[in-house]
Design a protein with these regions (language model features):
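Hydrophobic packing and interface segments
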Residues: 1-787
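Long, low-complexity intrinsically disordered repeat regions
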Residues: 774, 779-915
Length: 915
């Protein structure tokens, strides 16, 4: 099978997704739009939503202009990253913003039509709402996969004509191999991440400022029901549902979807880049794209399985959505198995990694539903605490949220282990990281239908509000309530799914970051022209950057828990999560305060408004404006913090500090996000459980207590919690994009600060040794292929990239004591060795006894801490090369390269190991 043909699953699937998104949109627009009053209310919501979106995009556009200039400076002036990066950054943000706009336009047009359809039957209401949500789902996957496909074809074409571009002004845009292509493509994920964070934070602040203001004054103080047209904040509340849960959720999952595919492609290019599996490199890159393409086909089939019957219960409705999702998941799993078998022959176990991702997504969704739906015990217990007041409701909800972290965290942990293990990670770390990435792709492959269930929620919620404000008959309201209740559960499930996918994607990005370090070091070496910059120094030997393994980089940058730079990074990452949450929650509080004051003012100053007298009309626009202004102003600081902190940590603490930052942010952010989303969901549904008639029903003291809990939970589940998904991914994306800046300038910054990191000391001492002639570096294009290929692929040495072990007396050498290698001594000694048997004694390979004599020489050079001659163990391996040296007669023939032969024959006999 021609692998390039299988790539076309991606662009064809993308075009098909966009085609069906247009079909579903057209079908929705052709349906009955409802009464004149219903259309009027929907018009208010649509106008407010679009007004907010355009104002947000203006602010985001200004940020993108500044960021573009910054990346252009890094690319064209400092030359620390690819010139393609600024352009890729813009396209990622543009497509993310476009998907949000199209999803919002669909959702705001669908609410009145869902209400009208629900007046006919429950099934028709479900169909209109769900297929309108499917527009968002398929727009996200279609635009995401189309963007990836276009970039892949462009960069492949540039690589194919690189020779003709070398002497032209376009030479700076030349790409040389698949590793460079995939790392360039990965950087457009930062554009998507940045847009997603602004959408999530801004949308979350908007919706919850309106929601909290409407609830505190409307329900708690005035005692009027939810979605009552007398409440001036009710339209802003409905606008917020679309801004936060349609545009925000869509941008969030667009980022995860693209990030997982691109990170996996980059990891595949690395894992299959050299060694015996190098012929599968292209296959490994294209596999995540092909799986995502067939996932679109499967999602389209699943959409047509979502239908229900009249008098359906909540579980029946959940079952109908679950049926569609499960059909899509099964079809995707089968197709992924076939693709893996075809594209990765001999590596079918990678299919197990895909299944690990798929299954973990289902388990996380189920766990979220269990802890947040009112049909289950945890949320009912929260509602039961309302009999003793709001304080115990808040305590119970917090406890429920904390308890709910168990299953998702364990599930993701097990999924990571299985995905890593199935791909062969315990024998080969690069393959294991590829398995984690492909697991994230498996979880997100059915995003078309899973995002449809998420976007369905706010559409159904708006339809219920529309029916309430239009005073439609109780039967219609009953149906819209059923759809709304289903939407609350799917929204909570979707948040859990988004958090789980964010965790797996961030894990894959951690691995991809190391590949960006490699590319950054290569670019730095090409810019400086210094031979020494083409090596990193790992355990007694220089290793060419292009052949270095994951473990080589971790050792070179001293990434271990005893390194204070790593520990400080971990603490900063954990702290950043809580500071970010605090900033977003305080932002909601400030904006909600303004909203409460405005609603109170209108109740006092507009005659007859609170009593519902004819002619008394609330000023909805002023409340929308307050939420909009509050969201625009408050979203900037936390968003910029998430972008600036990784850049500063990279410069001041280096790659080891960045790894700590990302690990701390991921572990803390994932757990806190689950806790906040599920605590907020349980408070919300506890209130709805009481409103259904339990514990006194609406208007009772228990109801008021649960309203307080729901109000506290609003920023938990719709602002801070969901924004953490993007925070942990955006930090990784920023680190990936500025990796070139980090590797080029962090050693200098740290040296000025007096940190003198290990990698800087290694390179400085090696540089001195090269200049004074005591160290001769090997050819970086060929040296190290054996050891590094073995480190990447060989079962005998899967991680280390070196056969050498560190003796106790050499531990100090690893900390920068010395860096010399035997090769330096062997090459000058090669000429006298064959002359006569007598002078051969000083040569290290001649006999064990005289070998100790020249040992002080490298130490005097200042670059000798890695000398093998100084080791007591050195004479033992020296005996093996002595056998060929014992025949002096033929020694004249191979005279020009005795040292090279010795180094290759016995890695342990010299400082270069396999080199």
């Amino acid at each position: 099978v021609d692998i390039q043909l299988l790539f076309w699953f991606a662009p064809v699937g993308a075009v098909l997704a966009l085609t069906f998104a247009y079909i579903f949109y057209s079908q929705m627009m052709a349906s009955d739009s409802g009464s004149e009053r219903s259309q009027e209310i929907a018009g208010y919501v649509r106008e407010g939503a679009m007004s907010y979106l355009w104002q947000q995009y203006r602010i985001v556009a200004m940020f993108f202009v500044v960021a573009f200039a910054f990346f252009a400076f890094l690319a064209f002036v400092l030359k620390v990253q690819s010139p393609w990066t600024p352009i890729a950054f813009l396209t990622g943000g543009f497509f993310s913003g476009l998907s949000g706009y199209l999803g919002m336009k669909t959702a705001t047009n669908a609410s009145s039509r869902t209400t009208a359809a629900a007046a006919k039957s429950l099934n028709q209401g479900l169909t209109v709402a769900f297929r309108s949500g499917a527009v968002m789902g398929f727009v996200v996957v279609g635009l995401g996969l189309l963007d990836i496909s276009i970039w892949w074809k462009i960069l492949n074409y540039v690589m194919s004509i690189k020779d003709s571009l070398k002497d032209s002004w376009m030479s700076i845009f030349v790409v040389h191999d698949y590793i460079e292509i995939t790392t360039i493509m990965l950087t457009f994920g930062m554009g998507a991440s940045s847009q997603a964070l602004f959408a999530r934070v801004g949308g979350g602040i908007f919706t919850k400022a309106a929601d909290v203001g409407a609830d505190l004054v409307g329900k708690t103080e005035a005692g009027i029901p939810e979605d009552d047209p007398r409440n001036p904040a009710v339209i802003a509340d409905n606008v917020g549902d679309n801004v936060g849960d349609v545009a925000g959720m869509g941008a969030d999952l667009y980022e995860s979807y693209c990030g997982s595919i691109l990170a996996t492609a980059a990891l595949g290019a690395s894992a299959f880049g050299i060694g015996q599996y190098a012929n599968l490199q292209l296959n490994a890159i294209l596999l995540p794209m092909a799986i995502s393409g067939v996932g679109i086909f499967a999602s389209l089939i699943g959409v047509y399985f979502v239908k229900t019957h009249e008098d359906a219960t909540q579980k029946d409705l959940l079952g109908s959505l679950g049926w569609g999702i499960n059909v899509s998941a099964v079809l995707t799993g089968i197709a992924a198995g076939v693709l893996t078998y075809i594209m990765l022959p001999g590596h079918f176990n990678v299919f197990g990694s895909i299944l690990a991702g798929l299954i973990s997504g289902i388990i996380i969704g189920w766990a979220t539903e269990y802890y947040t739906a009112s049909d289950y015990e945890p949320t009912q217990e929260v509602a039961g605490q309302s009999t003793t007041g709001p304080a115990t409701v808040i305590i119970a909800g917090m406890a429920n949220g904390m308890m709910s972290t168990g299953i998702p965290v364990v599930t993701v942990g097990v999924a990571v282990l299985f995905a890593y293990g199935f791909a062969g990670g315990f024998e080969n770390s690069a393959m294991g990281l590829y398995g984690i990435g492909i697991g994230a792709v498996g979880m997100l492959a059915t995003l078309g239908i899973t995002l449809a269930t998420d976007a369905y929620g706010p559409i159904a919620d708006n339809a219920g509000g529309n029916a309430e404000m239009c005073h439609m008959n109780p039967e219609v309201r009953k149906r819209t309530d059923a759809l709304d209740s289903l939407g609350n559960t799917t929204a909570a499930t979707g948040k859990g799914y988004a958090i789980g996918s964010a965790a797996l994607t961030a894990m894959a990005l951690l691995g991809a970051y190391v590949e960006e370090l490699r590319v950054g070091l290569i670019r730095m070496a090409n810019t400086s022209g210094e031979l020494i910059d083409k090596f990193i120094f790992v355990e007694k030997k220089p290793v060419p950057v292009q052949f270095a393994t994951m473990h080589d980089f971790m050792t070179f940058y001293d990434v271990n828990l005893m390194n204070p730079q790593v520990l400080v990074g971990v603490f900063l990452g954990s702290m950043l999560v809580f500071v970010f949450c605090a900033m977003t929650m305080k932002a909601v509080g400030r904006a909600a305060h303004s909203m409460v004051e405005e609603v109170r003012r209108q109740f006092k100053e507009i005659p007859g408004l609170l009593k519902g007298e004819a002619g008394a009309k609330a000023d909805y626009a002023s409340c929308v404006a307050i939420s909009t202004q509050g969201a625009q102003k408050e979203m900037i600081t936390p968003s910029l913090m998430a972008i600036i902190v990784p850049i500063l940590v990279g410069l001041f603490l280096g790659p080891s500090g960045i790894m700590g930052l990302l690990i701390g942010g991921l572990s803390t952010g994932f757990t806190v996000a689950v806790m906040m989303a599920n605590a907020g969901g349980s408070w919300d549904n506890a209130k709805k459980y009481v409103e259904s008639g339990q514990f006194g029903g609406k208007g009772s003291d228990c109801h008021k207590a649960t309203v307080v809990g729901d109000t506290v939970g609003d920023p938990f589940k719709d602002t801070s919690g969901p924004s953490l998904n993007i925070l942990i991914k955006l930090m990784s994306m920023v680190a990936v994009v500025v990796a070139g800046l980090t590797v080029s300038y962090s050693p200098k910054v740290q040296y000025v600060l007096g940190f003198n990191p290990t990698e800087h000391r290694y390179k400085e001492e090696a540089n001195l040794a090269v200049k004074d002639g005591t160290l001769k570096l090997p050819d970086p294009k060929t040296a190290g292929i054996a050891s590094s290929a073995m480190g990447m692929q060989d079962e005998d040495d899967p991680l280390m990239g070196s056969d050498d072990t560190i003796l106790a007396e050499d531990e100090e050498g690893l900390l920068g004591d010395d860096l010399a290698t035997d090769t330096v001594q062997q090459e000058p000694a090669a000429a006298p060795a064959p002359a006569t048997p007598a002078p051969a004694t000083p040569a290290p390979a001649a006999t064990p006894a005289p070998a100790a004599t020249p040992a002080p020489a490298p130490a005097d050079s200042g670059f000798g801490g890695f000398d093998e001659p100084a080791k007591p163990a050195a004479p033992a391996p020296a005996a093996e090369p002595a056998a060929p040296a014992a025949a002096p007669a033929p020694a004249a023939a191979p005279e020009p390269k005795p040292a090279e032969g010795a180094a290759t024959a016995s890695p342990a006999a010299d400082g270069f190991g396999d080199l």
